[in-house]
Amino acid sequence: MMIGNLHVFPNGRIERERKPKCARCRNHGLVSWLKGHKRHCKYKECACEKCNLIAERQRVMAAQVALKRRQATEDAIALGLRVVAGQAIDRLPQGPVWNTAGGEDEDMDYLDEEIEEKPPTPVSEELVPLKRKKVEETYELSSFSPIELLMTLFCEHEKHVLELVLEACHGNVLQAIEHFANVRRVKNINQMKLFAAATRMDHVFPNMTNFILPKQSFLIDSLLEQPTFPVSSQASTSTKTCDSSSVDSISPNSSTFESS
């Protein structure tokens, strides 16, 4: 229950709403509300021992905040990789950015004023469906099993090969993807080397294919055909003379036939 700036508990205890105060003014015995006070603080250039201690503490706090924000970003990236890899997550892990102690509030009063938060940018209605679409695509990727994801990315390999490599990687999908990506890269490099060597040989020996490749296709029937040899003119005339003499020898008008 709230009454003005007072918070009333059920047991009747009243607690005022806490407002951060300027630490530099507090060191010099003044009480100043921190909101909108940074530019007008008359002790902002003070170099006394207490104010120097506050400045050093502010630098340490700023470094801690930057470290926690970077850790939260890395956790978000790791969580996205887990979702893409298809690993089941029961609940979202608590990031280190939320593990801030309550006793540091007074030390960070002045720091809160120095760290200027960016105003929230208005989100147009056109960008909202795009964000929802990205979330839906992430959920669709998480529905793939590891072996299905590998089969989608490396369809040139057989399924049992993908299963063996995934088993050798102890179920680590990212390691299996890296392995197959390296295999594909080496294969492409070898193909490029072979193509370059063939192109080089073609430039050096342009007629090499005429000696290697036959001009006509080989048929087994060509072995069964009787070879034809070229016959000279003298051989042809002698052959004709022999044929005519043999015919005359057995002709019915010959003397041999009459004597018989």
Curated annotation (Swiss-Prot):
Entry's Gene Ontology molecular function annotations: DNA-binding transcription factor activity, RNA polymerase II-specific; metal ion binding; RNA polymerase II cis-regulatory region sequence-specific DNA binding; ubiquitin binding
Family matches, as InterPro entries: DM_DNA-bd, DM_DNA-bd_sf, DMA, DMRT
Similarity section: Belongs to the DMRT family.
Assembly behavior: Monomer. May interact with ubiquitin; the interaction may stabilize dmd-4, especially in neurons.
Highest classification ranks of the organism: Eukaryota, Metazoa, Ecdysozoa, Nematoda, Chromadorea
Signal peptide (UniProt feature, chain positions): none
Subcellular compartments: Nucleus
Name used for this protein in its record: Doublesex- and mab-3-related transcription factor dmd-4
